[in-house]
């Protein structure tokens, strides 16, 4: 059945009113949700952030060792070269004398060695350690292998100064670690080892004299028979490393 124009108009108005009412309620709901969201956001923003009090950590202050304490040279002179000959077979005995590969000295002696190192660096060199603290047990082993007081201190009559932790056997190298010409190698028992320097090259003699000058100014005394051997002028008792 066909509807009249009047009825069609009536139907159209009803649909329009329903659509309007529906849009009104949807818009109103959206506004309410927006208000709620804004309210929640404002509450979050308004909530004060709790203050965080920074925790202060007391820095660890290491107590300076006493002069008589044995310390690792590398802990204080990190750029020194360590080449302990008695910890290898590269020595006159051909055997390992002690197992430790750590160069140790009395703290008081180490400070003087540090001074020598700083002076040498100004001149383009640095120290190379061949031997430092030597346990008295190692001295007995050396004497057992070579019982000659000309070359090895007799531990039955008095220990080597190395066993006191205040003596080093050293040479110098360039700042890049390259070898420098010196009178002889380590544990050389010829006349080249003494401090006469008349039977070595001019360059070797001058380098040895430079080392001697720097070490003496730092507070060390050299041994006439070995250009590489230096002892702290301050004495310490014999030390046994257990």
What is each of the regions a protein language model found here?
Residues 136-140, 183-185:
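Extracytoplasmic/periplasmic soluble domains downstream of a signal peptide or transmembrane helix
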Residues 2-12:
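Positively charged n-region of N-terminal signal peptides that target proteins for export
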Residues 32-130, 145-242:
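Extracytoplasmic cell-surface/polysaccharide-interacting catalytic and binding patches
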Residues 12-27:
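Sec-dependent N-terminal signal peptides of Gram-positive bacterial secreted proteins and lipoproteins
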């Amino acid at each position: 059945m066909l509807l009249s124009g009047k009825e069609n108009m009536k139907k159209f108005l009803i649909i329009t009113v329903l659509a309007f009412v529906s849009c009104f309620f949807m818009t109103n709901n959206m506004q309410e949700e927006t208000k709620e969201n804004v309210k929640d956001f404002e509450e979050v923003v308004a909530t004060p952030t709790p203050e965080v009090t920074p925790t202060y950590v007391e820095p660890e202050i290491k107590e300076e060792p006493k002069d008589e304490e044995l310390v690792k040279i590398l802990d204080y002179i990190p750029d020194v070269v360590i080449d302990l000959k008695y910890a290898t077979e590269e020595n006159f005995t051909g055997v390992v004398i002690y197992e430790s590969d750590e160069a140790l000295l009395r703290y008081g002696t180490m400070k003087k060695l540090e001074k020598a190192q700083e002076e040498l660096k100004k001149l383009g060199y640095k120290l190379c350690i061949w031997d430092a603290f030597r346990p008295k047990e190692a001295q007995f082993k050396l004497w057992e292998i070579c019982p000659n007081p000309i070359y090895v201190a007799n531990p039955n009559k008095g220990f080597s100064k190395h066993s006191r932790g205040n003596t080093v056997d050293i040479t110098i190298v360039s700042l890049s670690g390259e070898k420098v010409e010196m009178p002889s190698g380590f544990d050389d028992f010829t006349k080249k080892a003494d401090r006469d320097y008349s039977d070595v090259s001019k360059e070797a003699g001058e380098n040895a004299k430079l080392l001697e000058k720097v070490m003496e100014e730092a507070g060390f005394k050299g041994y006439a028979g070995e250009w590489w051997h230096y002892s702290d002028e301050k004495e310490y008792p014999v030390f046994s490393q257990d």
